[in-house]
Amino acid sequence: MFAIIAAAKRRNIRHVMLNTNGIRIATEPDFAARLAEYMPRFEVYLQFDALSRAALQTIRGADLRRTHAMALANLENVGLSTTLVATVRKGVNDGEIGDILRHAAQWRCVRGVNFQPVQDTGRNEGFVAEQNRIVSSEIRRAILDQWGVFGEDDMIPLPCNPDAISIGYGLRDGTAIRPVTHLFPQEMLVREAPNSVTFESHPEMRARLIELLSLSCAGQRSAGVLHEILCCLPLVELPASLGYDKVFRVTIVSFLDRFNFCLAGVKRSCIHFVTPDGRIIPFDTYNLLHRQRPGPA
């Protein structure tokens, strides 16, 4: 694994993320410190589905509360940027969305939370589509109602795939989060077309805004772009130093499965697998059509 991270860091990759359940980070004393050596432009995507034992048992088959706590403590000790990633099942952990966000804000190393509606592909024991499927708009509503920090205009569609991805930004002050997405000029997100709003007066600001609302904008780069945008807006008080540690990002990313497959959605996909033979395959089709299945025992 370390060899793979090192190889990625040697290449022209803007930001490397390690997707992990956190077990080794929690249990091996020097593991987090070794990962921290790859900063900057490196981040941990930590599986974090719930705070309750019952929900974790249902989704992961184990009570991972202690593992999560130990992993976060070790990441906090080394100051390694971390995003919490929650798979959301209706009736299981959708009532904990606000609690997860509040918990995330307590850790200085956490840069935000990524919520993913459950996708019925691969290992998904006990999933009943009629009972457990949840859509992005329901998660967005839960963020607004349960957390109480973001308003209606603070979670907006991602331009590359507005049906599947929403994003919102806040500025961190200790454990307090101040929403800022509603301050972005909304007309700058409108696709340019005849008789539409023109952007000649602020072309650079629009370019920066679109760059910020991109899945490729992460780490210190997102902090820099956010600072450039907010400096252009009136009545925005910025911290003296706006680094990545002051940015708190909330995203909702939904993927397609056999029940909601949509070719137009695949064509707009922002997330891909790169295969050893050089092909680039959308995430939504990789698990359904391309992933190798284990043979009979």
Model-predicted regions and their roles:
Residues 1-117:
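Radical SAM/AdoMet-radical enzyme domain recognition
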Residues 18-19, 45-48, 85-88, 104, ...:
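Long, contiguous hydrophobic alpha-helical segments, chiefly transmembrane helices and signal peptides
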Residues 23-24, 93-94, 146-149, 249-253, ...:
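A short linear-motif detector with a strong N-terminal bias
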Residues 24, 129, 293-294:
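Sparse recognition of residues in long alpha-helices and their boundaries
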Residues 24, 52, 90-92, 175, ...:
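Residues that cap or initiate secondary-structure elements
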Residues 35-37, 160, 262-264:
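Sterically constrained small-residue positions within well-ordered secondary structures
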Residues 58-59, 65-66, 76-244:
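Radical SAM enzyme [4Fe-4S]-AdoMet core and its adjacent flexible, acidic
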Residues 198-297:
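Flexible mid-to-C-terminal extensions adjoining Fe-S/redox cofactors in radical SAM and related proteins
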